[in-house]
Amino acid sequence: KDSVYAFPFTSNTWFMYYDKSVFTDDDIKSFDTMLSKGKVSFPLSNSWYIQAFYAGNGCTLFGDGTDEAAGIDFGGDKAAAVTNYLVDLVANPNFINDQDGAGIAGLRDGSVNAIFSGSWDAASVKEALGDNYGVAALPTFTVDGNECQMKSFAGSKAIGVNPNCENPQIAMSLAAYLSGEEAQQAHYDERNILPSNTNIT
């Protein structure tokens, strides 16, 4: 408390990119609807992403995310229902596991119509989709007849300073500048790196 650990400079989460020529504004609200209308790629073998389904059905990591004593609750009926959903998902011919760049490669050649990633892939997706470039919040999915909201991890990337360096105050000043409002705006303008500074967002 009341300590500086690092200087945040961008968000670190993920969302959905999609081809607007394939999916309507209503389609993108439901993962299951999207799977019925086009090819959807999701990084199912990546644990940073797969938890979105479990969290969406009520499984928790440290309670609300801040209660270490609450531990991890990814068991029981809620988790089993999601696991069964994912088994069926893998068998769906319109689903493609996004590994080794399969998602963006598929957007480029038209074999994929939606992927799940973060701002780091914005330029590549925009290049692949052109005027059909769409970005949206995560959709819902249906488990045992219940509509569940996918939930991604939310965090930030930050600039840290070694407290044992020769000039820690100068290093902290540099880190503060590099993560400041002006620098974050420049990163967004030049490289599409989304800012964490609320004066910009």
Which residues fall in each region the model found?
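A structural signal for short loop-to-beta-strand junctions that line the ligand-binding cleft
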Residues: K1-Y18, K39-P43, G145-S152
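Flexible hinge/capping segments at coil-to-helix
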Residues: F23-K37
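Short helix-initiation/N-cap motifs at beta->coil->alpha
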Residues: K29, I96-D109, W120
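Paired acidic/hydrophobic, glycine-rich loop segments that form the ligand-binding mouth/hinge
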Residues: N113-G118, G134-A136
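Long, aromatic- and glycine/proline-rich binding clefts that accommodate carbohydrate-like moieties
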Residues: Y188-T201
